[in-house]
């Protein structure tokens, strides 16, 4: 099952509302899911999104939107989402593939 929360514009003001908690997040270029990542309690969803917003990752520099989901097991949930994407599209999201 994909991330259940809606997509938000990837702006500093919107990211400031993201949680300081563990979970998973997705980055989008328009309607295309380009990256799925996880956040631990030490590197929260908000912190991870701010990192991407600062354009520190070349592949996600064009990301326009994000979504997130809290999870007690972010690594497991990340794998579930990626496996669902692969089952549907036959490949990883482009920025996950670049990171592999």
Segments from the language model and where they lie:
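A broadly used, surface-exposed interaction patch
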Residues: 45-56
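Short linear functional motifs in flexible/disordered or boundary regions
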Residues: 48-49, 61, 93
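Short cysteine clusters
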Residues: 37, 57-59, 95
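Coupling/hinge elements of helicase-like and P-loop NTPase modules
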Residues: 88-100
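Secondary-structure transition/hinge residues
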Residues: 57, 86-89
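Basic nucleic-acid-binding interfaces
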Residues: 57-71
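GIY-YIG nuclease catalytic motif and its immediate N-terminal context
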Residues: 1-44, 69-83, 100
């Amino acid at each position: 099952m994909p991330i259940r929360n809606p997509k938000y514009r990837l702006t500093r003001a919107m990211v400031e509302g993201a949680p300081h908690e563990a979970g998973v997040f997705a980055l989008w270029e328009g309607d295309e899911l380009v990256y799925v990542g996880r956040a631990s309690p030490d590197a929260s969803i908000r912190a991870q999104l701010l990192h991407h917003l600062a354009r520190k990752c070349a592949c996600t520099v064009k990301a326009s939107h994000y979504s997130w989901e809290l999870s007690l097991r972010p690594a497991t949930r990340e794998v579930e989402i990626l496996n669902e994407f692969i089952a549907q599209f036959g490949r990883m999201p482009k920025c996950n593939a670049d990171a592999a």
